[in-house]
């Protein structure tokens, strides 16, 4: 389905600090003009996937669709950089994403909330393995996971850290989440689970003083956590725009056949 957009949409250009992205931003503003985020019809993010995630975290609540152009090292969430921007915006296909909503409790009693568009990951902070229990919708499913940690990934993020940890690639729009252990020692044969998107996931660190654990929501890290609750956000949703010949759904599908 193509995105309905005015013939000359107002574009706010955002760029990473990398020199190629900054240079491209100046060239695009000279050609198409520039406006504030508040006045824009669409945001154009110039950089790599890391910058796209930062853009979504900073401006996702604006409700403006985001069209990314790859000027970084990794560009799974980006389109290729070309000159015919207006034509491509007219033909762009939307992908609507809901982030994960995370609540973390630390040893000191502090509560920290964050969103994650790719994944939430718990990881041991020292050489010692983490001990983590896993509750789903209030029911304990794993009393004690021993290993490096555990990942909860969205479909859009399932091809990233989750896939590197041998987790499943999830189809876009499948309304599922991937729950994937990182280097599990016990239970040794458990390779994770595919969950309904509305599942509430509670991860408890069983020996936080001797075996400390950190949690990272995309790039936001909180150290020394004792409990983390994760669920799909019911309030926030973002729209990414992709060229129809290489949309996000096709990219996720193609990753399953990459060698």
UniProtKB/Swiss-Prot annotation:
InterPro entries: ATP-NAD_kinase_N (IPR017438), ATP-NAD_kinase_PpnK-typ_C (IPR017437), NAD/diacylglycerol_kinase_sf (IPR016064), NADK (IPR002504). Its EC number is 2.7.1.23. GO terms for cellular component: cytoplasm. Its cofactor is a divalent metal cation. One of its GO terms (biological process) is NAD metabolic process. The active site is at 49 (proton acceptor). It is found in: Cytoplasm. The keyword Amino-acid biosynthesis does not apply. Its main location: cytoplasm. Signal peptide: none annotated. It catalyses: NAD(+) + ATP = ADP + NADP(+) + H(+). Keywords: ATP-binding, Cytoplasm, Kinase, NAD, NADP, Nucleotide-binding, Transferase. It holds the Pfam family NAD_kinase_C. NCBIfam families: PRK04761.1. This is NAD kinase. It comes from Xylella fastidiosa (strain Temecula1 / ATCC 700964). The gene is nadK.
